[in-house]
Amino acid sequence: MATALNQNICFIGGGNMAQALIGGLLSRGLPTTRITVSDPVEQIRHVLEEKGIQTTADNLEAIKNADVVVLAVKPQVLATVLQPLKGLLSDKLVISIIAGAEIQTISDLIGGSQRIVRVMPNTPALVQTGAHGIYASEAVGKQDRELTSQILAATGLTIWLDNEAQIDAVTAVSGSGPAYFFYLMESMIRAGKNLGLEEKVATALTLQTALGAAQMAITSSNSPAELRKNVTSPNGTTQAALEVFDRAQISQNIQAALAAAQKRSQELAQELSDKTKSV
């Protein structure tokens, strides 16, 4: 049975997210000799070579012995990167972590391969606490799904989706999600300073509170709504703060913000599809 530890895995693109996945695979015991990374940037190749990873600037060379090919390039260079590989990936599992790149778009560019998995990761994967929304074409069987989960699991949570359209919702919730929490942290730190705390104190308290609240929500049998109610005493300080949130319609604005993110994700996917068709 195929497992991530007995596969040759090629990464087309060696940026931060690719390096996060590589780090996760190495931590699970995948030998460096089974990983090849193709990237045009010499500095990126040098960083990976220092870890014992085989690198090249030649995508054709990189995929030669690969069982799995992970596409990790910027959306704007997708067509340029994939067109020379057309017809050469039909015997390989292709995993894309490229934002906005629909399975049909990738399939049209590479030709032949229908074993395509689309992943929407997020940046906490860099510290092994990511959240990955995953969708696969019908040609991707159980073994390929398990293999994909193994490759991604070392960097965080993996959730398989029922249809590809849900990727846009995943993008809005978890793909862009870290920025929402950073925004809240910024605001709380700024408020703490305005209330008389030193910046380093306000920062430490805010970050630890965010970590603790997330850990409570993950480990508790109660929902986040129930946890919020449990710490909100009648006429207390928490209620005073939450009433300000309610008057400002924070909940409604968050829903509107995520809807805007989903819409933009849909637009970007369409723009990328149109661009690749015109190449």
Located regions from the model:
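NAD(P)-dependent Rossmann-like dehydrogenase/reductase catalytic/cofactor-binding core
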Residues: 2, 207-279
